[in-house]
From Swiss-Prot:
The chain crosses the membrane at residues 21-40, 54-74, 79-99, 105-125, 135-155, 168-188, 207-227, 239-259, 266-286, 297-317, 330-350, 367-387, 420-440. Keywords: Electron transport, Membrane, Mitochondrion, NAD, Respiratory chain, Translocase, Transmembrane, Transmembrane helix, Transport, Ubiquinone. Core subunit of the mitochondrial membrane respiratory chain NADH dehydrogenase (Complex I) that is believed to belong to the minimal assembly required for catalysis. Complex I functions in the transfer of electrons from NADH to the respiratory chain. The immediate electron acceptor for the enzyme is believed to be ubiquinone. InterPro entries: NADH_Q_OxRdtase_chainM/4, NADH_UbQ_OxRdtase, ND/Mrp_TM. The gene is ND4. Its EC number is 7.1.1.2. It catalyses: a ubiquinone + NADH + 5 H(+)(in) = a ubiquinol + NAD(+) + 4 H(+)(out). It is a multi-pass membrane protein. Pfam families: Proton_antipo_M. One of its GO terms (molecular function) is ubiquinone binding. One of its GO terms (cellular component) is mitochondrial membrane. GO terms for biological process: ATP synthesis coupled electron transport; electron transport coupled proton transport. This is NADH-ubiquinone oxidoreductase chain 4.
Length: 467
């Protein structure tokens, strides 16, 4: 993983040369991150950093999306502060994935809000103040419950290390209380209905890099927190509350998919589709099967490629040319923008889970695990595949089919920069769809280790009946 940070340092150095007067402290901070995976024994402050298969993949995805998010908006953003905020946000996410204790996880979980808040407040659309307030109030308030749960761990164990807390045997009542506190922050970050209302507003007003990183990486912190904070330690409570969470997930998938059919803003449509796909991830994560957990992580990776690509097209390429995001403004793009139309159709088919894409692998495994856990709710969740095909095909047919509307003027097709950006997102999605074992082998450590923890805790409870 040291090579990962070498690449990150090189990227920061390159950006400092391309962007005039880029602050050189960014290169220093990024270089210091190279040694962080080895600093696992800071006993004086109880902070631990390392990585495993799941963290490695999410960190690589973060590293992959950072330069794309900056280059996608290269022509519009001349401010040095804009690129510094994007790099700071990326560094916060990288450190968050390396944290091995709850305290440092919460610190960087909250610290990632600061650059995102500034990005939206300074470079967002007309209602950027409202969007910045939404993301701050929703996520900050919900995370306070997580902080209270972590404080209780500190009182009981005098330690918040993942390995130590995963071996702690708690009563069911205490587990349920901790589960409700932890899941409050995770449900807002995912987000699940009815706590999802902040995400469409934030996406519609956020700058392009903010939307790409929010959809591609920041939402993945919820799944990452679930597998780090809840499942190893609160396994009994997670089994107890799984039906309730499944009902929330199914309600989220149905509601967001149906309401997407009535939306006209292109960024809001993609934002609602992100909510639906993250609900599928939560279904697989709580399935208590290795199939579902693996599928949930694979779908997170797939969503990290496809959703930023769609945001790049509607919030970058089309908006730069027409300064409009209304769906009914566009029609017949395939007649004079064939390359952009082909790229959009490929990403749309991937987003609806078409076979031979990595999205199909993730959704199939997640729904398989959900059906094994709860057949009725899992079958209802499988209807989301049909609903996602409905709104995605409606959007694709409207933008690419027919003849152009009288409001549109003929513009140029994709530039070389935009073509390279699209290829860098489409090729991994299709390649991993043909060879999913490449990413599943990386991710195998996480569900396998989690399954071992669950078996071990079950054995302990059977051996000590009074616990």
């Amino acid at each position: 993983m040291t090579m990962l940070f070498v690449i990150f340092s090189g990227l920061t150095s390159m950006t400092s040369r391309l962007v005039n007067s880029m602050s050189k402290h960014m290169f220093t901070v990024a270089s210091m991150l190279m040694a962080m995976p080895t600093l696992y024994d800071w006993e004086e402050i109880d902070v631990y950093y390392t990585s495993d298969g799941m963290a490695d993949v999410l960190m690589l995805l973060t590293m992959y999306m950072l330069p794309l998010s900056m280059i996608s908006n290269w022509n519009n953003m001349k401010s040095t502060l804009y690129f510094e905020l994007v790099l700071n946000l990326g560094m916060m996410l990288l450190i968050n994935f390396m944290c091995q204790d709850m305290t440092s996880f919460y610190m960087y979980f909250e610290a990632s809000l600061a650059p995102l808040f500034m990005l939206m407040g300074l470079y967002g659309a007309a209602n950027r103040d409202k969007a910045a307030d939404y993301v701050l109030m929703y996520t900050l308030f919900s995370s306070l419950f997580m902080l209270l749960a972590m404080a209780l761990y500190e009182v009981m164990l005098d330690n918040t290390d993942y390995q130590a807390t995963s071996l702690l045997v708690l009563s069911l009542d205490l587990q349920c209380m901790l589960f409700l506190a932890m899941s409050m922050g995770i449900a807002v970050k995912t987000p699940l209905a009815p706590l999802h209302t902040w995400l469409p507003v934030v996406h519609s007003e956020s700058p392009l890099a903010g939307s790409m990183l929010l959809a591609g990486m920041i939402l993945k912190l919820a799944v990452f927190a679930m597998i780090r904070l809840i499942l190893p330690t609160l396994s009994d409570a997670s089994v107890t509350y799984t039906p309730f969470v499944y009902v929330m997930c199914v309600m989220t998938m149905m509601y967001t998919s149906i309401i997407t059919l009535r939306q006209t803003d292109l960024k809001v449509i993609i934002a609602y589709s992100s909510i639906s796909h993250m609900a599928v991830c939560m279904l697989g994560m709580l399935s208590n099967t290795m199939t579902g957990i693996t599928g949930s992580l694979v779908l997170c990776i797939a969503h990290g490629f496809v959703s930023p690509g769609l945001f790049m097209m509607v919030g970058g390429m089309l908006y730069d040319r027409y300064h409009n995001r209304l769906m009914y403004y566009f029609q017949g793009l395939i007649s004079y923008m064939p390359y952009l139309s082909v790229y959009f159709m490929m990403l749309s088919f991937c987003n609806m889970g078409t076979p031979l894409s990595i999205n199909f692998i993730g959704e199939m495994l997640s729904l398989t695990g959900a059906i094994n856990r709860a057949p009725v709710l899992g079958a209802m969740a499988a209807l989301s595949v049909l609903l996602s095909a409905c709104y995605q095909m409606k959007l694709t047919n409207r933008l690419t089919g027919g003849i152009k509307t009288p409001y549109m003027s003929l513009t140029s097709d994709c530039t070389y920069r935009e073509t390279v950006l699209m290829i860098t997102l489409i090729v991994p999605t299709m390649f991993l769809g043909f060879f999913p074992s490449w990413v599943m082998d990386f991710l195998w450590d996480a569900p396998n280790l989690l399954y071992m923890f669950m078996v071990y805790r079950t054995f302990i409870k059977m051996s000590i009946p009074w616990l």
